[in-house]
Amino acid sequence: MPKVRILILTSSTGGGHDARAEAFADWCFRLYRHDVDVRIERMLEKSSLVNRAGVNFYNRIQASAPWVHKAFYAVIELLSILNKDTVSFGKRYYLKVLTEYRPHLVFSVHDCLNRGYFQLARKILGADKVRCATYCGEFSGGWGYSRNWIEPSVDLYISRTRTAQDFALKRGIPAEKCLVRGYLMQPQAHFEIIPPKEREAFREQRLGLKRDLFTVFLATGGNGANNHFELLPSLVERADQCQAIFICGRNKQAYNDLVHWRSSHPEFNCYIEGYSETVHLLMQVSDVIVTRGGTATCAKALHFKCPIIFNATGGIMPQEELTWKY
């Protein structure tokens, strides 16, 4: 029996889409081993200079001026018109992937990779040869829930919450194609659980922190957008009452600066990590997490019942408003 081939469409706008793509791939291997062949494609940035520029601009303003996203989001919504029934930018590369890989399932985890992409896959491979599915990671509906998510011809539309599904139904997704799946996280987030009685020991032995001091987790997405240094003065003032865990994503400069800062402030207990593969463990030993409204981080925090302090410095992005509202 030939392997089932699954093409996952994602893009590194923020870190949540890639995290869900990787989680889905990990679950496929854990459940089906070598019977399923999964290929992850960062389709936007790999397919076109225009798309790549858009991704880079998205990440740049996320880090420095989140308020600009209100205008940028409105521009991106126009893709729903350009990609009504085919792919406008990056079509040549997408066709190359389709004809070479010939997937049985095209699975999108990104709002800009549904409309047009599903129609083109059916046209090239045959409507009876390929199925198309979407996992939408939004928490709720309204301004910020991109119309690019909504492709009524989808074979299966998976929502994170019932609230988000209700909005998708109103926007045109047929009810018989809808499913609420919940959080799409990597397997280890479900299986690597620290018992409550062992959490203090984890802080001390694995992180070098004090066992019983209030622990604040300053998080960031995979791309490393953060304002840790703006929050440090308030934490240092309370060095006898709290300690901190910092992660920096792929922001090497932020990591280097924090390491240097730590060497000059021995009075404050903190643990610093760059791109972390153990966020699910760090959350379990934290008393509170400070984060923006990114869906992946907030989903993990809710899953592990870690209280969230939302970081609105620089403004709230439209997509983040959906998380805040939920």
Q: Which residue ranges define each predicted feature?
A:
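Nucleotide-activated sugar donor-binding and catalytic core shared by glycosyltransferases
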Residues: 1-326
